């Protein structure tokens, strides 16, 4: 079964099935993070024009061409994290510590005669991204309800199509939105009169309500690289690499509301009336996948002290498998109801929803320049552009709600959302290294990444579509990394240490703003700030 939900400002164009991947899914699983060896991190990742580091295989494979000796090494990091969410009335903060194994690699060097002095090859494992984070908060005095949002976009759908009844399962009606089905069978939305295509939510004039949310995300992106490089006359260094991706992401979200003077369904008289209302919406999502990309790079050394670098990464062509599940629990107590059974409570859930999709991540282009000041110092500068608005999503071809054909076709609506929500990210990396003596080096770096989200989307000026029954989403602002490093060499052995402070802010939305364009309702949200203090340790041996 396939689902898509299409929104426009003030007008619902169409609502169909809930099991197509969304632009938000693509955004959640494609973060660009600065991760690598301790030397790489200590210099802010500014290695597009540098080399002789195992992290070159994930950035510019031409950097392998500068190796004179074979190298084997590994890296791990200790990450101390703080997640904070600030609403108008509350602030919530959580801490956690994680230890990760980030990198293992080997580079072999073959000496040649002729114009190409050396040929290098390398293999490596790299943890490119960690998607672990926690967002939790509490909004007092909400001005609307998730139920009102669902009622707003469900208007026009006959309630007989949403109701589970005997052998009829509304989830297998391809015209139904799964969140509408979940809400109607949980009495979150109701028909206020005899019109079966009109709906009301729980929030009415005079309702007082609060909202609570907790979203736990976990995941990673790993890349396995096979790279080849060469050195032509110690002036031109080329590199070509193949990256194999392994991706895993889970998202567990709870959203609760409690209200007094709400518009609730009185099951004794089968009519609506004022009362107390409470519900919890639980969602679980898992995305796993594999993919591949290609990388090509060049480093040119026109004079001894100057190096210029360029690298291009193709999209990563990903094959993804999705699983989603949603569940509600509810409790409504009408003011005028009598007897011990006056409370209407229960729960309702979706079936497990499994489907596959395709995702092409953006192209990546990077340029860099570095100055080598004698045997003592290096200063390096990089620029990278990642066009997130060019991501492409594909869904399985299907003939009807339970019959899939072969192959994949463009997910037209999700691809339109990608262009509406996202833009290109610009990344600037600056790094420096100073060699104190033959054994010790100190390093510093700065890494800045602009937000890849359009201002209209992050500010809540447009409706945001999500897949499945989880309406929540988060958009991040700019990301900054400040880095320091220390290196020690003894004969063929080396050990490097780096400290990385990352600060990322953003906005969490429990669900999208909705309503007519001139009267859009504000929904529960929080300003979020994530801070990471990472200690990165690398060790290796050159021979």
Predicted regions and their residues:
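Bacterial Sec-dependent N-terminal signal peptides
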Residues: 1-26, 539, 543
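A broad, structure-centric signal for solvent-exposed, well-ordered loop/edge residues
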Residues: 7-8, 13-16, 50, 81, ...
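Outer-membrane beta-barrel porins/channels
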Residues: 21-35, 40, 109-543
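Outer-membrane beta-barrel translocator/receptor signature
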Residues: 38, 50-59, 65-142, 219-222
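A generic local structural motif
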Residues: 59-60, 296
């Amino acid at each position: 079964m396939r689902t898509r939900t299409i929104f426009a400002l003030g007008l619902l164009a169409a609502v169909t099935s809930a099991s197509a991947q969304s632009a938000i899914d693509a955004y959640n699983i494609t973060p660009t993070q600065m991760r690598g060896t301790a030397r790489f991190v200590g210099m802010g990742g500014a290695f597009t024009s540098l080399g002789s580091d195992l992290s070159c295989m994930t950035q510019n494979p031409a950097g392998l061409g500068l190796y004179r000796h074979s190298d084997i090494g590994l890296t791990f990091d200790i990450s101390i994290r703080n997640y904070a969410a600030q609403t108008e009335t509350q602030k919530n903060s959580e801490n956690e510590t994680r230890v990760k194994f980030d990198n293992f690699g080997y580079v072999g060097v073959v000496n040649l005669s002729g114009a190409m002095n050396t040929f290098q090859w390398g293999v490596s494992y790299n943890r490119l991204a960690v998607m672990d984070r926690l967002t939790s908060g509490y909004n007092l005095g909400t001005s609307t309800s998730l139920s009102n949002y669902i009622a707003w976009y469900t208007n026009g759908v006959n309630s007989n199509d949403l109701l589970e009844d005997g052998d009829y399962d509304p989830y297998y009606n391809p015209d139904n939105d799964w969140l509408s089905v979940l809400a109607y069978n949980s009495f979150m939305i109701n028909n206020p009169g005899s019109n079966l295509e009109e709906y009301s939510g729980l929030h009415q004039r005079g309702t007082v309500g609060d909202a609570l949310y907790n979203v736990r995300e976990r995941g990673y992106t790993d890349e396995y690289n096979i790279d080849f490089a060469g050195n032509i006359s110690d002036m031109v260094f080329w590199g070509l690499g193949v990256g194999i991706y392994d991706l895993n992401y889970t998202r567990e979200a709870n959203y609760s509301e409690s209200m007094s003077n709400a518009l609730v369904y009185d099951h004794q008289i089968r009519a609506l009336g004022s009362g107390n209302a409470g519900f919890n919406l639980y969602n679980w999502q898992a995305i796993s996948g594999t993919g591949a990309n290609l990388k090509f790079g060049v480093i040119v050394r026109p004079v001894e002290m100057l190096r210029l670098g360029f690298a291009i990464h193709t999209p990563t062509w990903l094959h993804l498998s999705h699983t989603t599940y949603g569940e509600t629990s509810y409790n409504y107590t009408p003011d005028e109801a009598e007897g011990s059974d006056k409370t209407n409570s229960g729960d309702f859930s979706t079936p497990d929803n499994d489907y596959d999709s395709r995702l092409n991540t953006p192209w990546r282009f990077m340029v860099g320049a570095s100055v080598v000041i004698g045997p003592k110092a290096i200063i390096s500068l990089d620029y990278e552009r990642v066009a997130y608005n060019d991501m492409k999503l594909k869904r399985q071809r299907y003939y009807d709600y339970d019959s899939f054909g072969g192959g994949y076709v463009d997910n037209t609506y999700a691809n339109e959302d990608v262009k509406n929500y996202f833009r290109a990210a610009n990344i600037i990396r600056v790094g420096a290294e100073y060699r104190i003596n033959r054994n010790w080096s100190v390093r510093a770096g700065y890494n800045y990444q602009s937000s890849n989200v359009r201002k209209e989307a992050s500010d809540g000026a447009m409706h945001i579509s999500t897949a499945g029954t989880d309406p929540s989403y988060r958009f991040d602002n700019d990301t900054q990394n400040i880095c320091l490093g220390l290196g020690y060499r003894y004969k063929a052995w080396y050990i490097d240490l780096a400290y990385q402070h990352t600060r990322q802010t953003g906005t969490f939305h429990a669900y999208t703003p909705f309503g007519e364009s001139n009267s859009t309702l504000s929904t529960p949200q929080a300003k979020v700030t994530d801070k990471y203090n990472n200690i990165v340790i690398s060790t290796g041996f050159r021979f």
